[in-house]
Amino acid sequence: MNLVSLQNWLDNASFAVLFLTMLLYWIGAAFPGLPAINALGTAGMAIANLSIATLLGARWIEAGYFPLSNLYESLFFLSWGITTVHLIAENSSRSRLVGVFTTPVAMGIVAFATLTLPSDMQVSEPLVPALKSNWLMMHVSVMMLSYSALMVGSLLAIAFLVITRGNNIQLQGSSVGNGGYRTNGYRLMKAGELVSQPATPPVENNGFTRLESQNNGNSNTAVLNLATTPQTPTLTSTETLSPQRLSLAETLDNISYRIIGLGFPLLTIGIIAGAVWANEAWGSYWSWDPKETWALITWLVFAAYLHARITRGWQGRRPAILAASGFVVVWICYLGVNLLGKGLHSYGWFF
């Protein structure tokens, strides 16, 4: 079997494996009492990751350059990055729900590359002079890895919104992994200051549990008091969520934050590397090409997300909505500009 035939077989095999893996994750989510299904889903994602990596390796050997020169190759590299980040996120969160959201995206990318792109765009061709540079690997690969991480982080934020049903659940400590959650009006206080969350979720009632510190002589004694507050629509809706859902929401919020925190510096490095390469190739660090403009917009969206979480202390629904919007922005930056826009980065397909 020559390398071209191997690539054709691997791209179809990758699609088939991802499709079956998606079904396994969905069945596992619908029937959580089947642990074998969940294990098969993880194995399927690992097989797809290896299959795509082998395809890219064969492409590299055949063409003699890093396989990121056209849309077909970048789509497969993106899907490989998503499956890789998925495996990291799933291992960190210990939740198979991650695959319910990430697998359809990875499968859709592979399907688009395999079944939709014209055959002449799937063939490796000699590099144009502008791409004959070591910056091809240094810039494009880092950008694609950042897209992968940001997409997975955004998908986990969308999963958080689905799990919480869009309710305003405020999570404490998820940014630094302390654990614990609270709804509006529920928190732990010590001497008037926020300290930590209880080991068990609060009793659902019309009030909230509060831990206050009272000074008795030379020692501080924590006293657990039950206070009542007027019932609000937010509390009424959040009380329908089980502790299991809240715990899962906390995990998704935490992992989403960490994955986006990984993708953002990669995006920053990729943009800087691209500016240096642009200066070498075109004589200008920044020319407001549509791709450059949307890369800057993407950077600003996720910079706002991290700023809101780190500096402003946002957690829960608001940053999740911001991250979910970032998912759309990343796709516009990566695919929309390339296919529909005009500029130095356009692939010239469709229009």
Curated annotation (Swiss-Prot):
It comes from the Bacteria. Its main location: membrane. The keyword Membrane applies. It is found in: Cellular thylakoid membrane. The chain crosses the membrane at residues 17-37, 38-58, 68-88, 97-117, 143-163, 259-279, 286-306, 320-340. It holds the Pfam family Cytochrom_C_asm. Keywords: Cytochrome c-type biogenesis, Membrane, Thylakoid, Transmembrane, Transmembrane helix. Signal peptide: none annotated. InterPro entries: Cyt_c_assembly, Cyt_c_biogenesis_CcsA, Cyt_c_biogenesis_CcsA/CcmC. One of its GO terms (biological process) is cytochrome complex assembly. GO terms for molecular function: heme binding. May interact with ccs1. Belongs to the CcmF/CycK/Ccl1/NrfE/CcsA family. This is Cytochrome c biogenesis protein CcsA. It comes from Nostoc sp. (strain PCC 7120 / SAG 25.82 / UTEX 2576). The lineage of its organism: Bacteria, Bacillati, Cyanobacteriota, Cyanophyceae, Nostocales.
